[in-house]
Curated annotation (Swiss-Prot):
Protein name, as recorded: Hydroxyacylglutathione hydrolase
Tree of life domain: Bacteria
Residues holding Zn(2+) 2: D56, H57, D130, H168
Family designation: Belongs to the metallo-beta-lactamase superfamily. Glyoxalase II family.
InterPro entries membership: Clx_II_MBL (IPR035680), Glyoxalase_II_hydrolase (IPR050110), HAGH_C (IPR032282), Hydroxyacylglutathione_Hdrlase (IPR017782), Metallo-B-lactamas (IPR001279), RibonucZ/Hydroxyglut_hydro (IPR036866)
Length: 255
């Protein structure tokens, strides 16, 4: 199986998984990059996975379905065009012979879902949409801080080796904020150098890994003393886990 990030718009990635003949894509906000890749690689699109309803994740679905006849899977309780196979957490689906577990991850939107496969060529794979980014997380447009914190806790508990396929190339801006929050984090400092080198060569910083994100991502590290103290310096009223997370997200919004 091959895993490819297809760039779209300014900073989106449409993730494609394919074998020698067939493909699936995740969150195709634009049909054109997918159609070009299918033609170039000689592939048939079988499956479209959607994590949430925002247009930059769904805008290409109708054209791709019309062109290829692909099945479309997406969140059961979000406004999505039919025909759609609607999914909720703890359901499973099979695509390209791979078994995906659906995980409810509300926060960015009210009913956002993620797709986790325990074994793709020997390593787990996560498509997390706009819930988890490298060194960051999605804005809370519909969900609450408590929901997003719980969603991130769920993803952080996945196996260390899980490849994290985020939907946006936000890594450098997220790292700038993360370094402001936790300047003493050597793993964060080291990874910033690596990520800057990748981007200077127009290379993606993704996929990340769950292990790396637990080491560098302040939104997965809100219980670490260094992060807690930094957040409380920003907002002294932040005391419990949820208010600390909420204050951290607000800090990032203003950064």
């Amino acid at each position: 199986m091959q895993l490819i990030p297809l760039p779209a718009f300014t900073d989106n990635y449409i993730w494609m998984v394919h074998d020698e003949r067939h493909a699936l894509v995740v969150d195709p906000g634009d049909a054109q990059p997918v159609l070009e890749a299918l033609q170039q690689l000689g592939l048939q699109l079988e499956t479209i996975l959607v994590t949430h309803h925002h247009p930059d994740h769904t805008g290409g679905v109708a054209a791709l379905r019309a062109a290829t006849g692909a099945q479309v899977f997406g969140p059961a309780r979000e406004p999505m065009p039919e025909p759609l196979i609607r999914l909720t957490g703890d359901q499973q689906l099979q695509a390209l012979g791979l078994n995906f577990q659906v995980i409810d991850v509300p926060g960015h939107t009210a009913c956002h879902i993620a797709y986790f496969c325990a074994d793709v060529d020997g390593a787990p794979l996560l498509f997390c949409g706009d819930t988890l980014f490298s060194a960051g997380c999605g804005r809370l447009f519909e969900g609450s801080p408590a929901q997003m914190l719980a969603s991130l806790d769920t993803l952080a508990a996945l196996p260390d080796a899980t490849r994290v396929c985020c939907a946006h190339e936000y890594t450098l801006s997220n790292l700038k904020f993360a370094c402001a929050v936790e300047p003493v984090n050597q793993a964060l400092t080291d990874y910033t150098v690596k990520a800057e080198a990748l981007r200077s060569q127009q290379q993606p910083t993704l996929p990340s890994s769950i292990l790396l994100e637990r080491q560098i991502n302040p939104f997965l590290r809100t219980r670490q003393a260094t992060v807690t103290q930094a957040v409380q310096a920003f907002d002294a009223s932040a005391r419990d886990e949820v208010s600390i997370f909420a204050a951290l997200r607000q800090w990032k919004n203003q950064f």
